[in-house]
Design a protein with these regions (language model features):
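PP2C/PPM-type serine/threonine phosphatase catalytic domain
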Residues: 1-321
Length: 321
């Protein structure tokens, strides 16, 4: 029911660039209650797509077996993909960068390792983004190189974390509540080596309701550079046109509001009663003191009859306090 009552639109491109083969891969599955989007960049120097394809197929199949939005699930998906690459018989070690996004059509969570990137936009501005696990990225953070130098820096693909290593430590985000008109971009190095972040931001800031137009605009921007050595490039864009709304949640909210109103009204009534009682007590105390003062004055003047009457009045008021 969630998928039918929400609208997530995904489009992608994946091309070999100037390479002989495309070692990038993108895949996704949209189930009734959950969806999973995965992008991978094979970084093994062989001419097939084994690393990225194997990683994504493993993630998608594992997700379909037990779909969930939990942090544990995202870690499990990435670890299974890592084991798949480690266990594959090959002349060369299989390695890849990967980014996984899972959603229940209300919230999302992502996990990644390597230098495939996620960039999420809300209201036309960057809302979330991944951080490359490369030496060049660390140099940027240490202010050894400028941020715009990372695109072509010689250490940009020198990764300290990736699929296919024994000490595997992926990064998994917290849950992110989705909003309508959110936009999510997943892309490989063929994109970010040639189109800088500011240019991407401009495209998404000016994006209309057509996700395919946004994908085409970014590819046009990339190809307009006419790079001599264009790596494989893959870009996937997901538009969140409508977030699933739980009908039971509306009932719960209404019930909570009604209970809150009742509690507030009760608190006001109790407050008024307490104030009234306190006000009466203050007035009685003042009256008691008045009669007691009169009692003393009548005693001093020798009017004992009036003194007795005033004393009795003061005593009655004291008993009511």
């Amino acid at each position: 029911m969630r998928k039918q009552n929400s609208d997530f639109e995904a489009r992608f491109i994946s091309e070999e660039g100037s390479r002989l083969k495309n070692r990038d891969y993108f895949g996704y599955v949209e189930l009734d209650e959950f969806a999973c989007y995965v992008i991978a960049d094979g970084i093994t120097e062989v001419t097939d797509v084994e690393s990225a394809r194997l990683a994504i197929e493993t993630v998608i199949l594992s997700f379909q077996e037990n779909p969930s939005l939990s942090k544990r699930t995202v870690k499990r998906l990435l670890k299974r993909a890592n084991r798949a690459l480690l266990g594959k018989e090959s002349d060369r070690r299989l390695k890849a960068s990967i980014t996984v996004v899972v959603t229940d059509y209300q919230k999302m969570r992502y996990g990644y390792v390597g230098n495939t990137r996620l960039r999420m936009y809300r209201g036309g501005a960057v809302y979330r983004q991944t951080r490359d696990m490369s030496l060049a990225q660390e140099m940027v953070e240490q202010e050894k190189i400028a941020k715009d130098e990372l695109m072509q820096h010689e250490e940009r693909n020198n990764l300290y974390a990736y699929l296919g290593q024994k000490n595997f430590k992926p990064v998994v985000s917290k849950k992110i509540k989705l909003a309508e008109t959110d936009m999510i971009a997943l892309y490989t190095r063929g994109i970010w080596e040639n189109v800088d972040e500011a240019e991407l931001d401009d495209v998404f800031a000016e994006a209309d309701n057509e996700v395919q137009t946004t994908v085409d605009n970014i590819e046009d921007l990339l190809l307009s550079r006419q790079p001599e050595n264009l790596d494989n490039y893959t870009l996937a864009v997901i538009f969140v046109n409508k977030v699933y709304q739980n009908p039971e949640k509306r009932k719960r909210i209404k019930k909570i509001v009604m209970i809150t109103v009742i509690v507030v009204i009760a608190a006001i009534v109790i407050g008024v009663v307490l104030w009234f009682l306190r006000d009466r007590k203050v007035q009685r105390t003042e009256d008691m003191n008045y009669h007691f003062t009169n009692t003393v004055e009548y005693i001093n003047t020798g009017n004992y009859v009036r003194a007795k009457e005033e004393c009795e009045q003061a005593q009655k008021l004291a008993e009511k306090l």
